Amino acid sequence: MRTSLLVAALGLALAAALPGGAPLAQPDPEATMDRSLLQRQDLPYRFSAVDLDSVDGQRHYRLWLGRPLQAPPAAGYPVVWMLDGNAAVGALDESTLRRLADGDAPLLVAIGYRTPLRIDRAGRTFDYTPASPGQADQRDPLNGLPSGGADAFLDLLRDGMRPAVAAQAPLDTARQTLWGHSYGGLLVLHALFTRPGEFARYAAASPSLWWRDGAILGERAGLEQRLRGKRAELLLWRGSAEPASPRGSLKAEPGQAMARLVDDLRRVAGLTLDFQPLDGLGHGETLGASLRLLLARPAVERQR
């Protein structure tokens, strides 16, 4: 009952932001990936690439692996999986990598697409959005592109990407983090709500709570049962200058939906939640800011 009330309340908050108002700034569709860090040999990380395709052969991935120079721990490297990998690589910098190397350095896996572009709009629209039950034609409500491939993507990450990465470097599968921004943040919440044991830490920056009128909020029902006997950590970020939706207005109390979700999730046994508002940041700016904040944290610990 509580979850139903939460979904209804958040739906009203999201609906208030939909009509009119200033649109959310969209990323430049022609912006190219910043690859400068990948070629450098003076850093404590070395980057390589692994290519694979979706099961249906329609999407073509390039995984950028950032491996620390130091030897792995006995159990393998902790792993940070980064969605929108082409953009994530561009958000990394020298100081972040050097700081990581001074501690329990994780293996970085940026899940990108084989394109020179920073963002693969069609790929992420399909891969990062949950299926809508009862709809024969799954189309994204914002851009009209095919959507609904989230579970196929998460299955591929588990059954295809993870073994491919493990063939290149030893992984500690008990210390995995999944990070995503915007639609990627939506996928992170979907992964937490539907398969909470597959990662130890879930990190969602500016998740698209508005998507399909807040459909992701309905997936939260039953999380306590799915999480029983397990533990998970959720990190959430949101910029104070973000509207509530792509067509929303800053006057529509844009942080209300996130605040209510945070309040609800704090009550879930076994889930550790940390919400950090990012003062003054807009939607696009939270991508790099959240990733750097995530990587400034110690690697996720093994469950005891």
Swiss-Prot record:
The organism encoding this protein is Pseudomonas aeruginosa (strain ATCC 15692 / DSM 22644 / CIP 104116 / JCM 14847 / LMG 12228 / 1C / PRS 101 / PAO1)
Q: Where is this protein localized, as stated in its record?
A: Periplasm
Which keywords accompany this UniProt record?
Answer: Hydrolase, Periplasm, Serine esterase, Signal
User: Mind telling me what this protein is named?
Assistant: Iron(III) enterobactin esterase
Q: What is its main location?
A: periplasm
Q: GO MF terms on file?
A: carboxylic ester hydrolase activity; hydrolase activity, acting on ester bonds
Q: Which EC numbers does the record give?
A: 3.1.1.108
> Span of the secretion signal?
1-25
Q: Tell me what turns on expression of this protein.
A: Expression is induced by the presence of enterobactin in bacterial environment.
**Location of the active site:** S182 (charge relay system), E242 (charge relay system), H283 (charge relay system)
- Superkingdom is Bacteria
Q: Which SUPFAM superfamilies match?
A: alpha/beta-Hydrolases
Gene disruption: observed consequences: Deletion of the gene strongly inhibits Fe uptake via enterobactin.
